[in-house]
Amino acid sequence: MIISTWSRPRWTRRWPGSEYPPMSEPPRRRYDYVSDAAEIYRRSFATIRAEADLSALAADAQVVAVRMIHATGQVGLPAEMAFHPRLVTTARDALRAGAPIFTDAQMIASGITRRRLPAENAVHCLLHDERTPGLAYRWGTTRSAAAVSLWGSELEGAVVAIGNAPTALFHLLELIADGGPRPSAIIGIPVGFIGSAESKVALVENPWDLPYLVVHGRRGGSALCVAAVNALAQEAEI
């Protein structure tokens, strides 16, 4: 009979790098690469401007598109974008006036650069609110959609950024159709295979002429949504 003598190791928690003294010098340079942050940004945005076809977009929309391309590395993205003619001006005016930002994902809320926001705008994501799971269960929907119902009256005039759940975008449009508060602008870039493309079409065709930004099809996600919000929050491209 074989008797195992293995026991679970006892890991000692250490702060990262605590076993090594702080480095006084960087490691020896072995590769040829650009390390200056400002130069990386400058070259990146110049490359995007050179390679992407932005000709179909207005000048203010181009700034937003460049930021979104920078977040994804996909220079063909503008072909899939649709900007309402008033999206950029309306969203920026709302943010300057102190409008809150509502989003469907905590990753988006965390990614929004607070120092870019022009009026210390509040950023809300209620996905993890204690009321959300119960609402989702009773209504037979996703937690992302249920959380939208908790946005309440503050939604009036707000900027909405939906980057994960098509159900959240559909639910928002249904709330508005029932006479609920209307945001000033909607960034609708939910990602996915089920309902994503359809929810964006519904937003573009909204009967209230609400300003929108979408990336048609299945493409979307937190990185794209965050890039759009950060670009709208600050007019400078870099």
Predicted segments — roles?
Residues M1-P22:
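C-terminal catalytic histidine-bearing segment of alpha/beta-hydrolase fold enzymes
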Residues R14, D104, I187-G188, A228:
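Buried hydrophobic positions in well-ordered alpha/beta secondary-structure cores of metabolic enzymes
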Residues M23-A59:
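Charged, compositionally biased N-terminal leader segments and the immediate start
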Residues A56-H70:
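N-terminal glycine-rich anion-binding loops that anchor highly charged ligand groups
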Residues A79-A94:
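A short, well-structured juxtamembrane/interface segment
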Residues A105-I176, S184, P190-G192, K200:
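Conserved mixed alpha/beta catalytic, RNA-binding, or beta-rich assembly cores of soluble enzyme
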Residues I194-I238:
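C-terminal functional extensions of proteins
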